[in-house]
Regions:
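A glycine- and small-residue-enriched flexible loop/hinge signal that marks low-structured segments
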Residues: 2-64, 68-392, 403, 418-419, ...
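C-terminal structured domain segments
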Residues: 395-443
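C-terminal edge-of-domain segments
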Residues: 430-465
Length: 465
């Protein structure tokens, strides 16, 4: 994968490298959208590793709906098409239950630690006298069911029935064999949820790093964890990975303190939702849940569109509405805020990130989510194309022309997609191609949305047209 190079730096490892600069002005790899990385807590599912979940598959069958899995739910409400899911934590204890058999027992153990509240029922299958069924419940809901042969060595048959289970392990104990009597919702011995520390978030971020994503959100309003996410995004940027973090703190935090938190990031790859307390149709949402929905929206929105004044149909009411001066202050300090449109629908006031100050390599465009998404997409697509040609063409006039042509093709595609005004690829004139190294300039003008519309009204006293 492409990596970052500083001006004047030459690399040891073969590969393609990129550098970002401010464009000098006067004064057939496509986009991958809708991918959200989510760090959360649960009581079931694989712990400390990533599970990639497609939207149509749902997360409930893997992680249930407990803990802070609602972060995934909100990301999907926001439009996420794919989740890079990681249950954070370490330690804990697995729930288990031992069922009596003719002799000995059959022990059923949850594969993962957590306090899920499982119970088990064993009964004759109503439609087949030769079969029994074992049903695992989580709370009052059926979670998993297996069938096994009735009569004979039912204990072994039950163990065999769980052989392909993704959630439970079954084993004989105390020489278990023979019939397994009926039981009704016999409770599992309680487990313990894994403990969660900042170290567990750091581990989860390392796991997530192995996968492509557009945005990332976490299940906490803790500022220390938000800083971990920010540092993580900076680190993977230097390895050619482009992600945007979306966070929110508790609305009980003073307005000025929240402004300071947002301004403290001052970067294009962090989005801070300042008035996160909202009412959905059936529940109150705030903090990480709101940030997760915005993460889904940012990831899913094509880079030729802006989220400014995009209505959020899930939200019915804003619980913390600002004055005009507060909205202006929020935007100036790098906050994303919710407001109402003229139809009293909740929408995003201004789709900006936390960047406040520009520098020698970042212009004003880096303050906007749309333009950051466009630029990240361009760099990703060009980097992948360049990486695909490493070692495949000669470093001569023809080979470099091939590289430039392939890169130009992607630029042209993004122009046609309405994402760029123009983009031109040419060999860099400041560095001379030699041995195995060559350099290219990508001169880009990216598009923006009309977000400030000024109207001049000119009235006259005369009533004659």
């Amino acid at each position: 994968m492409a990596g970052y190079f500083q001006i004047g730096e030459t690399k040891i490892r073969p590969g393609s490298y990129f550098n970002v600069q401010k464009r000098e002005e006067n004064n057939e790899f496509g986009a991958v959208d809708g991918v959200v990385a989510v760090l959360f807590r649960s009581s079931i599912g694989p712990l400390g590793t990533v599970k990639v979940i497609e939207r149509e598959d749902g997360y409930e069958g893997v992680y249930g709906t407990g803990g802070t899995t609602d972060a995934m739910r909100e990301a999907l409400y926001g439009g996420a098409q794919k989740l890079v899911a990681c249950w954070i934590g370490s330690g804990g204890a697995n729930e288990s239950v031992s069922l009596e058999a003719g002799t000995g027992k059959v022990k059923i153990t949850a594969q993962y630690p957590g306090r899920a509240g499982f119970s088990v029922t064993v009964r004759q299958k109503l439609t087949d006298a030769g079969r029994k069924e074992c049903i695992i419940y989580m709370g009052a809901e059926e979670f998993e069911k297996v069938n096994f042969t009735a009569g004979g060595n039912e204990a072994q048959a039950l163990v065999d029935a769980f052989a392909d289970s993704k959630h439970f392990l079954a084993a004989l104990e105390e020489g278990g064999e023979g019939a397994v009597p009926a039981v009704s919702q016999s409770a599992f011995a309680s487990g313990e949820d894994p403990a969660v520390t900042n170290g567990d978030y750091s581990h989860a971020l390392e796991e997530v790093e192995k996968y492509y994503f557009n945005t990332i959100c976490v299940d906490t309003e803790d500022k220390g964890v938000h800083e971990l996410v920010s540092t993580f995004l900076d680190r993977i940027y230097n390895a050619g990975r482009f992600g945007i973090g979306v966070v929110a703190e508790k609305p009980t935090l003073d307005f000025e303190e929240r402004l300071q938190s947002a301004a403290g990031f001052d970067k294009e790859n962090m989005v801070y939702v300042i008035n996160s307390h909202v009412a959905a149709k059936l529940e109150e949402l705030e903090g990480y849940r709101t940030a997760a929905l915005v993460a889904g929206m940012v990831a899913a929105c094509p880079s030729n569109q802006s989220l400014t004044h995009t209505v959020i149909h899930r939200y019915a009411e804003i619980r913390e509405l600002f004055t005009n001066s507060q909205y202006e202050k929020a935007i100036k300090n790098g906050c994303l805020a919710f407001s109402y449109n003229t139809d009293d629908k909740v929408w995003i006031e201004s789709a900006n990130n936390t960047m406040i100050h520009t520098d020698e390599t970042h212009d004003e465009g880096w303050k906007k989510i749309r333009r950051v998404r466009t630029r990240y997409e361009l760099m990703y697509r060009l980097n992948v194309q360049a990486d695909a040609m490493v070692g495949k063409v000669d470093n001569d006039i023809n080979g470099r022309a091939t590289i430039a042509g392939k890169l130009q093709g992607i630029c042209n595609a993004m122009v046609n997609e309405g994402k760029l005004v123009s983009a031109t690829v040419a060999e860099n004139t400041g560095y001379v191609a030699d041995t195995d190294s060559c350099w290219f300039d990508i001169d880009v003008i990216d598009k923006d949305s009309a977000e400030h519309i000024y109207l001049f009204y000119k009235f006259g006293f005369s009533t004659i047209g």
